[in-house]
Every structure is written in structure tokens, then in C-alpha cells.
Amino acid sequence: MTSSKKPSNSSAKNENLYAIAETSGQQFWFEVDKYYDIDRLNAKEKDKITIDKILLIKDKDNISLGQPYVKNAKIELEVVSHKRDKKIIVYKMRPKKKTRRKMGHRQELTRVMVKSISITNSTPKTSSKTEVKKKSTSPKASNPEN
């Protein structure tokens, strides 16, 4: 006998909402109330950060695709902590020589949590444009003394 649980209302609401955004030279698939590790940001813990470079937003049945970015869209993030990634070993060696070099690198990361994904539908401002008439100019007469 199998039992299936229905998702709670809060998870079902956020289940259909996601955004693909560009930050730190990479593209991330952001969902609300999830943690992400991105390259180190100059922000303190508990600071709020806004990302405006949104490539795609999906909300239920609506998909907004940017060219290259979606206008009036933003993602609100909260900095949770700063940390360092696992060490990456770089080993260089020349065969048949006694040349070996072992180095390592740890990437500095910032852990962020997505607070909200939003798109605002602002109507473009209508302004009355006045037509500017060009004055017809006649070519200047050349100076015969030259």
C-alpha cells in the first residue's frame, strides 16, 4: 500500500516559480527559500542584495524570456555566510626532468538565500512628442576672391 502526501501550500506556491539569472560570470537557476554558493560578494552577513540580470522567469504558466535580460525583474537575496570551497590541487610536471610544482587554491564563496523573485509590469510612459521642423538651408555661396 502506497501513500502519497500532498505538498504543503507554501512549497506548492513556490514550486512553479523560478528564475535563471547571471551573477559572478555564471548562470544560476534560482528558486525561493533555497541556498546558493556564489563567488565572494562585498557584503556583510544578513545584508540584502538585488540581482537585476535576469535571463528567464517562470511563474506558473507564464514564461518571460529576456533579450538578453528581462525588464523590471529582480531577485532579492540575503547573505547567510562567507566560506571557502574545497581545495583544488594544481600539479605541474615535466616528464624526464626534475621539474615538479604542486600548488593549491581555495575559492572564496558567499552563501546566499533567495528571499523573493519578482517581476513588475510597469506601463511605458506616454509622452507627447512635438514635431521639430527642419529649416531648409541653402548652400552658402562660395567666396570668389579665393
From Swiss-Prot:
Q: Which domain of life is it from?
A: Bacteria
InterPro entries attached to this UniProt entry: bL21-like (IPR028909), bL21-like_sf (IPR036164), Ribosomal_bL21 (IPR001787), Ribosomal_bL21_CS (IPR018258)
Q: Which Pfam families match?
A: Ribosomal_L21p
Q: Where is this region: Disordered?
A: 96-146
Its keywords, alphabetically, are:
Ribonucleoprotein, Ribosomal protein, RNA-binding, rRNA-binding
Q: What are the BP-aspect GO terms? A: translation
Gene Ontology molecular-function annotations: rRNA binding; structural constituent of ribosome
What name does UniProt use for this protein? Large ribosomal subunit protein bL21
Q: Which gene encodes it?
A: rplU
